[in-house]
């Protein structure tokens, strides 16, 4: 987005953004999310930013994040994460959803894993769960009580936009 506003990849705001992402990566390779649930969402967005930066110092972080995304893929090929991950401060697995599967797929694509078996399994999950009208089932997840995350309660997790972008 900054590049579309006229900044060059070598400009200070880009360098600072890359440095921030590299400093805030979790030990397991993921990133904490702020607006979506949670580590899958944060990781896919961080990876997109790092990939767009073309910063060579980010290659290890990108690789590590790709390994993490693969490690949390569900047996059905999709991805899912519980809202409890906010309270736990770590990824909490949940049944696969289309929106979180999209985050997993988009994250893997950002790592450069464009022909991996994990990517194929995730895409198959989305195809298998897509309705005849092209949409996916929408589920509601309610974040833990007392959390500022109640801004969108119940939170819609499974809208058509994110899965369709994957």
Regions found by a protein language model. Name each.
Residues 1-19, 23-166:
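An alpha-helical repeat/solenoid feature that recognizes helix-turn-helix modules
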């Amino acid at each position: 987005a900054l590049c579309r506003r006229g900044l060059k990849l070598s400009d200070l705001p880009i360098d600072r953004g890359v440095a921030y992402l590299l400093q805030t990566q979790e030990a397991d390779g993921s990133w904490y999310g702020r607006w979506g649930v949670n580590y899958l969402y944060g990781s896919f967005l961080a990876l997109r930013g790092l990939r767009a930066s073309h910063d060579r110092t980010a290659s290890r972080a990108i690789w590590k994040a790709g390994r993490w995304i693969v490690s949390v893929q569900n047996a059905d090929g999709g991805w899912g994460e519980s809202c409890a991950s906010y309270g736990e401060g770590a990824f909490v697995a949940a049944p696969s959803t289309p929106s979180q599967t999209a985050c997993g797929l988009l994250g893997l694509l950002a790592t450069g894993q464009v022909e991996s078996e994990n990517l194929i399994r995730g895409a198959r999950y989305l195809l298998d769960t897509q309705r005849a009208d092209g949409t996916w089932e929408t589920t509601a997840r309610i974040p833990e009580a007392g959390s500022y995350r109640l801004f969108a309660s119940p939170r819609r997790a499974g809208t058509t936009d994110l899965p369709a972008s994957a």
